[in-house]
Amino acid sequence: MKRLIRIYFLSCLGFLLFGCGISNYDRGQEFLAQEELKAAADYFTAATEENVGADEAHRELGITYYRGRFFPQAVTHLQIASDTLKDERTALYHGMALEQSRKYEQAIDAYEEFSALNDSPEIGYQIKARLAHLRNQHLIQSAKQAVQAEDQIDLTTIPEDKVAVYYFELLPGRDDLVPLQKAITALVISDLEKVRGISVVPRLQLQRMLDQMRLQQDTVFNQETKNRVGRLLGVANVCAGTIEGLADLDLRLGATVVNVKAGEIEAASVQQGVESDFFDLQKSMGFDILDALGVTPTEKQKRVLNRRATESLSALIAYGHGLAASDKSDFVTAEQYFKLSLKEDPTFQLALRELDYVRLLAEAQEQNLTQIEDLAMESAKARTARQQRLNRMNQALSRQFIPPTAADSPREGDINPPKSEIQVVVKN
């Protein structure tokens, strides 16, 4: 009889320790740590069907699929988890799974969520570089899709306030001004962005569209190309222009506005003067373009528009060289030119912004998602350990007698507890 009782007791104990003590989720974690992905997936799948902790099980199942390179399945489960879990682990793996699935726009959102949750400067910079890379990839992807669906474009759906600024055509005579083709475009975009009532396409979006169009050199600046670019970018108007070097270092800037829906072109501005007056010419041309677009800036906006991004033509030319190199993914050369631009004019914010951008893209070229994953997880572990230490210290430093509950009320013969608080000081 005693033997039967002992066997029964041991059986119950084993059931309690191994049957109830280790959950499907815990088993999945063990196998995931050992890279036994099939077994981990089975246990996490079972855990997702349980009432408690299903969202965490979906997260770990998504991570398991991610490590097995089953990215669509990883996205599915990490999306379910991200609906309720707002933690670094969920956001990071969700972003990486979306990136691997080439869902760049959604991946950007997930990485931004992770960045908001993470406070490590090192991993923060890595994610910032990743975001720069993904935004570029998203522009490329969107441009490809637009070209593929070109026949389905409905001009009636294009918003009237959307504008693109095309590259300026350099007329023969001054090859040294080639960098101004992109630099002037960037200046005009920067000015138009300051005016309410119009939405301006970023220069890089224009560039990525031109990359996908694969234009012949002799068609880059013709009228049909500008119309087509406008349709593909979904804009109502395309601003374009010319740069002409004249005798005695004179310059002539011309600007036109192409109405994409009507296919009509309107002369907007002609500005001519000596090279030293270039920035006055550029500003006057900008106001003429706004007038041709039917936009009247307020007095406050006029004051903002009259501020010059730079007054150094050499800085602007170096900046244009940098843009050309950056567009070809030659980030080393681009960085050199942007540094030169800033050497000529340390206050040139457009050059500083592009310098930061190419450095991020250069960093992204060297990145490995596995390294980012490891770095982020180490950062999370260090932060958790630090918080646990702080919690222990806080408990030790604030330890005191707690008033007794009803169940612990004094009984006859008990010694009354001290009325003063007892502080425990922990010394190193």
For the regions a protein language model found, what residue spans apply to each?
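Canonical tetratricopeptide repeat
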Residues: 60, 93-94, 130, 354
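Short, solvent-exposed, polar/charged sequence segments at loop or secondary-structure edges
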Residues: 199-251, 316, 321, 328, ...
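Amphipathic beta-strand/beta-sheet edge segments enriched in Tyr/Trp
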Residues: 91-92, 102, 110-112, 220-293
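Short beta-strand->alpha-helix linker/helix-N-cap micro-motif
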Residues: 156-226, 238-247, 266-267, 304, ...
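Register position in tetratricopeptide repeats
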Residues: 33-34, 67-68, 100, 133, ...
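Pro/Ala/Gly-rich low-complexity, hydrophilic intrinsically disordered segments
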Residues: 105, 109-164, 282-321, 347-416
